[in-house]
UniProtKB/Swiss-Prot annotation:
This is D-threonate kinase. One of its GO terms (molecular function) is kinase activity. The keyword Lipid biosynthesis does not apply. Substrate binds at D17, R60, K90, I91, D92, S93. Its EC number is 2.7.1.219. It comes from the Bacteria. Catalyzes the ATP-dependent phosphorylation of D-threonate to D-threonate 4-phosphate. Can also phosphorylate 4-hydroxy-L-threonine, with lower efficiency. It comes from Pectobacterium atrosepticum (strain SCRI 1043 / ATCC BAA-672). Gene3D superfamilies: Four-carbon acid sugar kinase, nucleotide binding domain, Putative sugar-binding, N-terminal domain. Belongs to the four-carbon acid sugar kinase family.
Length: 442
């Protein structure tokens, strides 16, 4: 089989309820996609397509024939307004709803040879073993979902649930085989044999990533069937990012665990560049040369439309090495912190001035789309280096990131965001990136 890597294209998600629609859509949005959730297919038009459209058919508790009709109509409506790309049939990770009817309808409407069914959401404790759904270590039929008052589940077997509403040929690929390098070849083989529904075991999120990569290697786009975990995996594989006219410059001096997780989440986007600061280099005779190099790296990222994150903490062990570092340098903790903060302030000023000097004419300044300052000492050091005399608060992002404008600083009315190092969750920096992108587009 030739190695055919599918291009990005758009994404359609067909969900059977509103909360499930949002669960699937948020994973795409967090990776830079422009996502709309649509309640009525009759209101769908080309302007809503963006990168991804999620259509809620509200059919989980409907009759199977109604669920089938609504699912087919959703796919047809998307195609009619010009939608092209990947189609995900979002299902409940505990198999509630009209599983067989909706998958069969989506497969027929999409007019593709096969559906890949990966129902798991490992990060939520839902996995697939030997074709059965397990929730937090318990077989599905031994959990509360089996007695759901509206849509009870009578079997943990995905194949059995499908067979209740469709007679399409089914095959299972268990975990050992899922993790093989030739998974795409195996999928093609089953499709060639006439299998229409392929159930794949999944134990961790990386398994879903491997499944998506195998799907992308096929010469056709299969229908993807799964829960939020699968849409997250597809979002990771897609490149939804676009060049940002005025990207964010983030300076993160916090060594907190959550700050590092926030950076890790942001780095999943292909339009984010990381500039690492080696603390040892700050105290070397060549520190000015090092700063010039870091300034150049940041400038290159920003002028290429990439958000740039500057950080001083490279791994979780650094916080435990501070005392040893202080002894080596003959400094107190306070002196070390002040030196680092001052350096980051000067580096930020150098980057801002270098970027501004690239302006095509003297009447329109060229500045970052925003500044994000994480860590209290870092925030005040940068503000001081930029000449600020105060801060005008305008609002808050993600419940923990005040934003506003530095008063009398060289960055003028550039939005500035500050965050205490340990605040927020893993998606906080992603929320900041989206805020800046929306702010710049206004």
């Amino acid at each position: 089989m030739p190695n055919v890597q599918q291009s990005a294209g758009q994404v359609l998600v067909v969900a059977d309820d509103f909360t499930g629609a949002n669960d699937a859509g948020v994973g795409l949005a967090q990776h830079g996609a422009r996502v709309s959730v649509v309640f009525d297919v009759n209101t769908l038009h080309a302007d809503l397509l963006g990168d991804a459209v999620v259509i809620n058919t509200d059919s989980r508790a409907a009759r199977d024939d109604v669920a089938s009709q609504r699912t087919a109509a959703a796919v047809a409506a998307w195609q009619a307004v010009g939608g092209k790309g990947w189609i995900i049939k979002k299902i409940d990770s505990t198999l509630r709803g009209n599983l067989g009817a909706e998958v069969a309808a989506a497969l027929s409407a999409a007019d593709v040879p096969v559906a890949l069914i990966a129902a798991a959401s490992p990060t939520l404790g839902r996995v697939t073993r030997q074709g059965e759904v397990w929730v937090n270590g318990r077989r599905l039929t031994d959990t509360e979902f089996a007695s759901d008052p509206k849509t009870p589940v009578t079997s943990a077997s995905i194949a059995a649930r499908l067979a209740e509403q469709t007679a399409l040929p089914v095959a299972e690929i268990h975990l050992d085989e899922v993790r093989q390098a030739n998974l795409a070849h195996r999928l093609q083989q089953l499709a060639d044999e006439g299998t229409r529904l392929i159930i794949l075991d999944t134990d961790v999120q990386d398994d879903l990533t491997h499944i998506v990569n195998a799907a992308r290697a096929l010469p056709f786009r299969p229908l993807l069937v799964g829960s939020a975990g699968l849409s997250d995996a597809l979002a990771t594989a897609q490149d939804f990012t676009r060049k940002t006219e005025k990207p964010l410059l983030a300076v993160v001096g916090s060594m907190s665990d959550i700050a590092q997780k926030q950076i890790a989440a942001a780095r999943l986007r292909s339009d984010v560049t990381l500039v690492e600061i080696d603390i040892n280099a700050l105290f070397s005779p060549d520190s000015s040369t090092v700063m010039a190099s870091q300034c150049e790296d940041a400038l290159k990222a920003l002028t290429n439309g990439h958000h740039c994150i500057i950080r001083t903490c490279h791994n979780e062990n650094q916080r435990f090495e501070i005392d040893a570092r202080c002894r080596e340098l003959g400094l107190s903790r306070q002196q070390l912190g002040e030196t680092i903060s001052h350096y980051l302030g000067e580096l930020t000023r150098s980057i801002v001035q270098a970027l501004d000097s690239l302006a095509a004419d003297g009447t329109r300044r060229r500045l970052p789309g925003g500044l994000y300052l994480s860590g209290g000492d870092i925030a005040i050091a940068v503000a001081t280096a930029l000449g600020a005399t105060g801060f005008q608060i305008k609002g808050q992002i993600a419940s923990c990131v005040p934003w506003g404008y530095l008063l009398n600083s060289i960055v003028g009315m550039t939005p500035v965001m500050t965050k205490a190092g340990g605040f927020g969750n893993e998606t906080t920096l992603l929320d900041v990136l989206r805020f800046i992108e929306e702010k710049v587009s206004e």
